[in-house]
Amino acid sequence: MDEDSLNQFLSINQILRKKVYSIQMPEAIILDLDSTLLNAYGKQEGRAFNFHYQSNGYHPLVCYDGITGDLIKIQLRDGTQYSSTGVVDFLQPILDEYLEDFPEIKLLLRGDSGFATPGLYKQCEENGTGYVIRLKENAILRDKASYLVDELDEITEYNQLKVLNAF
């Protein structure tokens, strides 16, 4: 599928979305961002080795409705692209569509650690979109959350003493 065909497909998808929403408007949409490997064999243009997946193929960027599973947008990318490469440009037309055509729908963006980029956070905040991004554990996060671990330890110890004293 070439870029023109994909754009036509996405336009049809947008028209269908408007028709569906005219019948039943959702209260909220979870914009579920993801990237995945599409295995490819031979010498297709854009086919490349992806180190994360340890395989050859394409690495498309995808946005689904996290509630219904409906495809909102897909962008074919070569296999070498990192998960978040181009995500701000990919997402803005989606945000524009929802903010202009469906301003009453609450938007929440969800992504894994591959989308933990300040540009995406800023974009969501500037467009009034909530976001939840899973972060990989690291020393900085452990340090920032250490007080919670200490509090949990204290609560657990207190509860154990309460149980022991109850007998």
Residue ranges and their predicted role:
Residues 1, 27-37, 69, 107-116, ...:
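Short, conserved catalytic/metal-binding motifs centered on acidic residues
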Residues 1-62:
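Active-site-proximal, Lys/Arg-enriched surface segment
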Residues 24-27, 57, 66-67, 103, ...:
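Short, well-ordered loop/turn elements at secondary-structure boundaries
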Residues 35, 65, 73-78, 113, ...:
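Short, structured patches in soluble enzyme cores that scaffold and shape functional sites
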Residues 41-46, 72-76, 86, 118-124, ...:
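Short acidic, glycine/serine/threonine-rich loops at helix termini
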Residues 51-102:
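Electropositive, glycine- and tryptophan-enriched low-complexity nucleic-acid-binding patches
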Residues 82-140:
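Domain-level cores of phosphate- or acyl-group-handling catalytic modules
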Residues 133-167:
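An anionic, glycine-rich sequence signature occurring as long contiguous blocks
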